Amino acid sequence: MRKIAIFNQKGGVGKTTTAVNLAAGLSRNNRKVLLIDLDPQGDISASNNINAQYNLYHFLMEGADLSECTTKLGKNLDIVHCDHKMADAEHQMAKEKGNVNFLSIKFPQNMDYSYLIIDCPPSWRMLSKNALQYASEVIIPTSTDVLGYDSLEKTIKRIVEINKSSSQKTLVSSILPTMFDTRNNICKEILLRMKQEFTPLLVTEPIRVNSKLKEAPKSKMSIFSYDKHSTGAEDYWKFIKLVLENEYMYDLSLMQSQREKALKDYYVSGKKRELMIVDNKVTFGFKFVTNVSDSIKGHFIENSKKQKKAEHA
């Protein structure tokens, strides 16, 4: 079961849109998906007219059964929704002594789902920290503008921080550029910079600006149900195909060994960097340097020192 957190500490970057359409697209490919709305704003729940008696708050904080808190959205797609009470839950979580992860404790280890998609709040608080520690990977949607790029760097720094304090390392599988205007030079420059800084293996093809993506939630639909011929549907479908392609390279034992090696100190040109060590044959993401004091620079592999010596020989 792949547990994917959708996270960016900045709001308005297409995080919820990505969570909804990723879940919908995967379910259309015969994958059983549980969508977890962890954002106290409850945008997913509101846009789907969910008024179930029990929700995520009751499951995490009051001992309700998961089945009581789960609503069916469609074939192969369920949701655990939330509302403003999750803000109260966050305060209660913060009072707990020690590093208690409520999601890890409460959600069963083995569930009848292929994917868990977690829509995180756009903040660096307890709910987001719990989600990132619980998830096996994170997708970072980021708008293709200056503020979006700045937030991307800050978000990855946050992930580095939480990996330092946790035995379970969160791996970044994709950076998803959103709100890409093909006519705008700033968008083009930002996208190019993302690919240069984080490598094209990590940065996916962008989600273009498309009015249908804004209209779909008003009609309580995913973009695929609302307008399957729109550019929004086309772009998200490409992204979902990428997620599915990576699925066949998803080796849990390999990922576990990578986690054990992750965040080792690595020195390049006298500068301390933290590196996610990855088998070069695995294209399932994670190929990036995780530390940035000024900016995040490219991808280094373990033999880079040897390569430098060879160049100067």
Predicted stretch roles:
Residues 1-313:
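P-loop NTP-binding core
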